[in-house]
Amino acid sequence: MFSARKSSVGWLVSSLAVFYVLLAVIMPIALTGSQSSRVVARAAEDHEDYGTVIGIDLGTTYSCVAVMKNGKTEILANEQGNRITPSYVSFTDDERLIGDAAKNQAASNPKNTIFDIKRLIGLQYNDPTVQRDIKHLPYTVVNKGNKPYVEVTVKGEKKEFTPEEVSGMILGKMKQIAEDYLGKKVTHAVVTVPAYFNDAQRQATKDAGAIAGLNILRIVNEPTAAAIAYGLDKTEDEHQIIVYDLGGGTFDVSLLSIENGVFEVQATAGDTHLGGEDFDYKLVRHFAQLFQKKHDLDVTKNDKAMAKLKREAEKAKRSLSSQTSTRIEIDSFFNGIDFSETLTRAKFEELNLALFKKTLKPVEKVLKDSGLQKEDIDDIVLVGGSTRIPKVQQLLEKFFNGKKASKGINPDEAVAYGAAVQAGVLSGEEGVEDIVLLDVNALTLGIETTGGVMTPLIKRNTAIPTKKSQIFSTAVDNQKAVRIQVYEGERAMVKDNNLLGNFELSDIRAAPRGVPQIEVTFALDANGILTVSATDKDTGKSESITIANDKGRLSQDDIDRMVEEAEKYAAEDAKFKAKSEARNTFENFVHYVKNSVNGELAEIMDEDDKETVLDNVNESLEWLEDNSDVAEAEDFEEKMASFKESVEPILAKASASQGSTSGEGFEDEDDDDYFDDEL
């Protein structure tokens, strides 16, 4: 356990006074930190020989692959001639199908056709979003060790696949498309993920790449990749752009500045469970209710009927982007009854209006986080097939006071295009040597300190990769081990944030509290993957943890809740912080006085003086024990001032008797960093 304890009372100590020497020994080392923000392999001489590196947009509903060759970026078509490939995997009695072939037989083989796997990857089975999603999936999802597994029948036998395996199959398909085009083997790739994918989801995506035989060199946020596609030809004046990425299953918004080939992410927000699939589900539910009302038949329990309805609902949604009404016709839909209904654009918009409006909240958030106004935005870039919906465009343009969104890039292909450019940077392709990508992390990362306080090491919207270190110490005398509890979130107290993982550093040499120095380092790489280490500065012993994909990171609902609650309860959080800091400062000060009086100063103090100081120490410790939960920050500060007033003259006299040449006692010194934070 850590405690964030910093002294608000400084002692101006003569260099010859033993008491001041003691304090000098336990003064904190200045916090060290480095932030390597301008990172992305930049020039040809910096890259390894990876061969041709491909860029893959691994989407919820569709995936896309691109490659940079001879300075030009190509979006590659599959064997059907399509430049986007359905993220579907299906098993028949004879074979495994991936892409268009799998999607085309989904209605007739719903139990063995897997889609929307991106909504399960990197999440635990008991995650509320997983539980919500599996209710609407026709295939079976089972629980194994609190991890979702997909169960299908393969050649007459039950077979279970992890989301990583299924995603690996889709990545393998993209790899094959690239190899067919290039005529050679491909081993390295850049893969995109939603900006709000957490560490577990990113790790799982890298694992999927390994399953597909791909070394994923870089995980790039989807809106950032789209910004590269949009901004390659805008290399002079600075542009502030909003990338609005509404895909099949996820939604991201990023605010970037582009100038002289530098793409800097200012802020990012989003929802990993919002997209075209949700709009489809609204239609499916609407049509199922209409059918039940007309025929008194519930089709929701019939997987084949629901798969047919889903297929036609998606077609209807797409057609309504270019026309105002469409008709859904399904022969022998259920129990031999045909299905026939008309859907207008107005009805589609009515059913989904709440979801459309929900996308504006992250837009407001990135503006607030970056400190910019609507008027400061130069361009709005639309990414993802769902941005073709007229109502979505209308709401977004209205939000920006009538500013028209840019339609200069294909929303289905922009992310893969940007990924291919980044791949070209890594493989040393000509023409992209000067591109620099500055991305950010989505949530604050920190550790628990005494009192359950969240002590941040890497703040939200920090440019990545980055590395930050801070010195901590022990919370009790002769503490032999410390447990490092790693959290993500925006609240002041760890109970309101999400635990990512923990580990223990043991065999610390016995010493009074506050003396050992434990250096904790957070390293967040360019893929957004976190490694935490702790080193005992005395012995050199070190332990570390990489937050891996089995740690159960946050769902998007949790992320949204954290940010909203952080804003809503900002005053409460500030009060908690102030109270905790004041309590820790007072308690630390009392213990240091106690240890000093019983230690080096014991031989030079009068017994009466020593007794007086220790009486004050014991009275203060008793007060702390009785009042820590109920006292406010002001109470701790008052007790601190009273304690200091009582003991300071006595300690100053002891220092003077030791041979202080200055004859000075103690003076207030504006120094908030007298003591190390404690473990």
From Swiss-Prot:
Residues 665-679 have a biased composition (Acidic residues). Residues 1-43 form the signal peptide. SUPFAM superfamilies: Actin-like ATPase domain, Heat shock protein 70kD (HSP70), C-terminal subdomain, Heat shock protein 70kD (HSP70), peptide-binding domain. GO terms for cellular component: endoplasmic reticulum lumen. It is an enzyme of class 3 (hydrolase). ATP binds at residues 59-62, 118, 248-250, 314-321, 385-388. Residues 147-301 are annotated as: Nucleotide-binding (NBD). Its EC number is 3.6.4.10. It comes from the Eukaryota. Probably plays a role in facilitating the assembly of multimeric protein complexes inside the ER. Is required for secretory polypeptide translocation. May physically associate with SEC63 protein in the endoplasmic reticulum and this interaction may be regulated by ATP hydrolysis. This is Endoplasmic reticulum chaperone BiP. The chaperone activity is regulated by ATP-induced allosteric coupling of the nucleotide-binding (NBD) and substrate-binding (SBD) domains. In the ADP-bound and nucleotide-free (apo) states, the two domains have little interaction. In contrast, in the ATP-bound state the two domains are tightly coupled, which results in drastically accelerated kinetics in both binding and release of polypeptide substrates. J domain-containing co-chaperones stimulate the ATPase activity and are required for efficient substrate recognition. Keywords: ATP-binding, Chaperone, Endoplasmic reticulum, Hydrolase, Nucleotide-binding, Signal, Stress response. InterPro entries: ATPase_NBD (IPR043129), BIP_NBD (IPR042050), Heat_shock_70_CS (IPR018181), HSP70_C_sf (IPR029048), HSP70_peptide-bd_sf (IPR029047), Hsp_70_fam (IPR013126). GO terms for molecular function: ATP binding; ATP hydrolysis activity; ATP-dependent protein folding chaperone. It comes from Kluyveromyces lactis (strain ATCC 8585 / CBS 2359 / DSM 70799 / NBRC 1267 / NRRL Y-1140 / WM37) (Yeast).
